[in-house]
Amino acid sequence: MSDLSGASRPKLCPGCRLREPAGESDMLLIPEGALRLAGPGRKIVERCDGQHTLDDIVRELKAEYPTAEPSRIETEVNTFLERLHQKRVIDLES
């Protein structure tokens, strides 16, 4: 079970970073290889800086995608960050 809450401040773990776009799909480089980021994945990971809370990330994405269903954004951000946490790609600060 994840420790993810609205006040959690996700931060990329050491050795994990975004690959700068070179005309291809966005990639998150991790010590074990790379993860392809789809949809708003890059925008979520960019906010995993230890400063933004989960609530901040969800609020900013709702503003950026005003036609998307708000509850879907919240669910997808939560699920995505839980997966990254399980893979030890992000730490959760409080």
Q: Predicted segment positions?
A:
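Long, low-complexity, charged/polar intrinsically disordered regions in eukaryotic proteins
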Residues: M1-E32
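Long, charge-rich, low-complexity alpha-helical segments
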Residues: A34-S94
